């Protein structure tokens, strides 16, 4: 039997936790990664060179490779604040930016680095051009730019994306639509709902592919609420927002952590964008999705509450075997 095909969609921090474990399984992986980041090193490089931001893609490259730890530290090395124009830039971002300039696009750069790192899966930016994320709040106010959205004190109604450097309609990267249509399973998240997952899904071609695919669509719900995005959200609220943006109820299965996060990890100063544990609304989830898998997916590490990638992937593999039958 052929390996199942799984496409994982989101931002570099959240989905990397899943990809690190998933790469060890007998599965054909495609990662589709957001290009809406406009803060920090990625924002500086995209503005200076008008390229798709490299940071999320850098993290996914590392998650899907089996390079020695030292090489990983080299790729992730961040220049010191005293290093002038290089200050704050991870070396990997500069490498991606350099190859992007040589080869004409970030898409081409990632394909070259995928081969260089002997990665067996596929990694695609969701779009081949940098995108600007726009958030429309329930009070009617609109904010442009991912890094600015969380700073506005309000509840987000919906988000959309535009091309940053031209007036053309945002388009999916080559092969992304094909990957979605050919997948046995689509995995959304984990990661920031409005600023990491949805920037990919609201690209019209990706939204339409998700409507057409016969794949099982799985959402890995966040463990913690997020400042400026999902304050006071339940897990069912997360799913409702996804379905709202997709235009219909497309989430087949939701994976939800039910392990209790210790109080010491709430409102952490170390991870100041995260607030408290997401409320579990089992009845609401059952109305919003066909299948709910509630289990202990929690890993406490370095002062933060994260998904245990191995436990999540174990459930995903069990599920994909069922849907492929």
Swiss-Prot record:
One of its GO terms (cellular component) is cytoplasm. Signal peptide: none annotated. Pfam families: CofD (PF01933). Keywords: Cytoplasm. It comes from the Bacteria. GO terms for molecular function: LPPG:FO 2-phospho-L-lactate transferase activity. It is found in: Cytoplasm. InterPro entries: CofD, CofD-like_dom_sf, Gluconeogen_factor. The keyword Cytoplasm applies. GO terms for biological process: regulation of cell shape. Belongs to the gluconeogenesis factor family. HAMAP family: Gluconeogen_factor (MF_00973). Required for morphogenesis under gluconeogenic growth conditions. This is Putative gluconeogenesis factor. It comes from Streptococcus pyogenes serotype M3 (strain ATCC BAA-595 / MGAS315).
């Amino acid at each position: 039997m052929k390996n199942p095909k799984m496409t994982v969609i989101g931002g570099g921090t959240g989905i990397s936790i899943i990809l690190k474990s998933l790469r060890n399984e007998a599965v054909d992986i495609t990662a589709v990664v957001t290009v809406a980041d406009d803060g920090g090193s990625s924002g500086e490089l995209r503005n200076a060179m008008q390229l798709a931001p490299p940071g999320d893609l850098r993290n996914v490259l590392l998650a899907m490779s089996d390079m020695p730890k030292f090489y990983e530290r080299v790729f992730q090395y961040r220049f010191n604040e005293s290093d002038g124009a290089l200050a704050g830039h991870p070396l990997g971002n500069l490498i991606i930016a350099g190859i992007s300039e040589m080869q004409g696009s970030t898409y081409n750069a990632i394909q070259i680095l995928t081969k260089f790192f002997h990665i067996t899966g596929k990694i695609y930016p969701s779009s081949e051009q940098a995108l600007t994320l726009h958030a429309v709040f329930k009070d009617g106010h609109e904010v442009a730019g991912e890094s600015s959205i969380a700073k506005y004190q309000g509840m987000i109604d919906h988000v959309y994306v535009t091309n940053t450097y031209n007036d053309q309609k945002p388009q999916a990267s080559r092969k992304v639509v094909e990957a979605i249509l050919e997948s046995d399973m689509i995995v959304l998240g984990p990661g920031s709902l409005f600023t990491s997952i949805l920037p990919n899904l609201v690209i019209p071609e990706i939204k339409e592919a998700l409507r057409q695919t016969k794949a099982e669509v799985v959402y890995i719900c966040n463990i913690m609420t997020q400042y400026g995005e999902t304050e006071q959200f339940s897990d069912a609220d997360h799913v409702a927002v996804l379905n709202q943006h997709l235009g219909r109820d497309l989430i087949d299965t939701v994976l939800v952590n039910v392990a209790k996060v210790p109080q010491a990890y709430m409102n952490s100063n170390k991870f100041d964008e995260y607030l408290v544990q997401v409320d579990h609304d089992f009845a609401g989830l059952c109305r919003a999705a066909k299948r709910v898998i509630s289990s202990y997916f929690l890993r406490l590490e370095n002062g933060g509450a994260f998904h245990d990638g191995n436990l999540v992937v174990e459930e995903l593999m069990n599920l994909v075997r069922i849907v492929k039958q």
